[in-house]
Amino acid sequence: MVKVTFNSALAQKEAKKXEPKSGEEALIIPPDTXAVDCKDPDEVVPVGQRRAWCWCMCFGLAFMLAGVILGGAYLYKYFALQPDDVYYCGIKYIKDDVILNEPPANAPAARYQTIEENIKIFEEDGVEFISVPVPEFADSDPANIVHDFNKKLTAYLDLNLDKCYVIPLNTSIVMPPRNLLELLINIKAGTYLPQSYLIHEHMVITDRIENIDHLGFYIYRLCHDKETYKLQRKETVKGIQKREASNCATIRHFENKFAVETLICS
């Protein structure tokens, strides 16, 4: 039988080695702290770079907000802007030469024809928008017309040719928006039954307009993406030659107490 014994002196010596000295302190580092403080240098973003990125983001958001505001204002004016009044009405006129005096009692009854059109009045902006549909019987062309009193311009859009024509506003023919509005209200109420005459104006096409931005919002809206030309008034000649008339667009419309036949010739 073998008896196993331990040397007590050796055990005490090993225990003394494991104990810290009286003048020393034990430093204990938590494992989590070591994991947080020890980062990969590639993952550390410099302070200046972070600040520059923040400024770029702020400027980008500011530009986006400005674009949304400006775009919203433009879309509101383009789509949501409604005219003060919209009217669909007509006027009767004599197709023959203008008769200002009373006809004799035995004279035959005058041959009246009718023009019907849509009229939108933007009174605050000083603009009249006239839409002439395809006539049923008259030999005239459909068109959209803008009279801009602020820009002092008139624009015709020939719907058959899809071309625009611009000319200075003729205030002797076109009523101002407020006066035209009163006339239309009276026609609608039946207090004024228009039976009028037809006057003629003859225009010729001159130069092409490459940039229409300066023509105002309403004319730009009418003529955007269309070939646009300048017009020049020509002295009306009684009995226009057929060859000349064949090269003309004929637009019959009214924005006064009388009807107007506009010839636009190349």
UniProtKB/Swiss-Prot annotation:
Protein name per its UniProtKB record: Integral membrane protein 2B
Self-association and partners: Homodimer; disulfide-linked. Interacts with SPPL2A and SPPL2B. Interacts with APP. Mature BRI2 (mBRI2) interacts with the APP amyloid-beta A4 protein; the interaction occurs at the cell surface and in the endocytic compartments and enable alpha- and beta-secretase-induced APP cleavage inhibition. Mature BRI2 (mBRI2) interacts with the APP C99; the interaction occurs in the endocytic compartments and enable gamma-secretase-induced C99 cleavage inhibition. May form heterodimers with Bri23 peptide and APP amyloid-beta protein 40.
PROSITE patterns: BRICHOS (PS50869)
GO annotation terms (biological process): negative regulation of amyloid precursor protein biosynthetic process
Any matching Pfam family: BRICHOS
Domain of life from the UniProt record: Eukaryota
SS bond partners: C164-C223, C248-C265
Record lineage: Eukaryota, Metazoa, Chordata, Craniata, Vertebrata
Glycan attachment points: N170
InterPro entries: BRICHOS_dom (IPR007084), ITM2 (IPR040145)
Keywords: Cell membrane, Disulfide bond, Endosome, Glycoprotein, Golgi apparatus, Membrane, Secreted, Signal-anchor, Transmembrane, Transmembrane helix
Stretches assigned to the BRICHOS domain: 137-231
Role played: Plays a regulatory role in the processing of the amyloid-beta A4 precursor protein (APP) and acts as an inhibitor of the amyloid-beta peptide aggregation and fibrils deposition. Plays a role in the induction of neurite outgrowth. Functions as a protease inhibitor by blocking access of secretases to APP cleavage sites. Mature BRI2 (mBRI2) functions as a modulator of the amyloid-beta A4 precursor protein (APP) processing leading to a strong reduction in the secretion of secretase-processed amyloid-beta protein 40 and amyloid-beta protein 42.
Stretches in topological domain Cytoplasmic: 1-54
Region (Necessary for interaction with APP and inhibitor effects on APP processing): 102-134
Site (Cleavage) location in chain: R243, E244
Family note: Belongs to the ITM2 family.
Transmembrane segments annotated in the record for this chain: 55-75
Lumenal domain ranges by topology: 76-266
One Gene Ontology cellular component annotation held by this UniProt entry: extracellular space
Designated gene of the protein: ITM2B
PTM info: The ectodomain C-terminal part of the imBRI2 is processed by furin producing a secreted Bri23 peptide and a mature BRI2, membrane form (mBRI2). The remaining part of the ectodomain of mBRI2 containing the BRICHOS domain is cleaved by ADAM10 and is secreted (BRI2C, soluble form). The membrane-bound N-terminal fragment (BRI2C, membrane form) is further proteolytically processed by SPPL2A and SPPL2B through regulated intramembrane proteolysis producing a secreted C-peptide and a BRI2 intracellular domain (BRI2 ICD) released in the cytosol.
Entry's Gene Ontology molecular function annotations: amyloid-beta binding
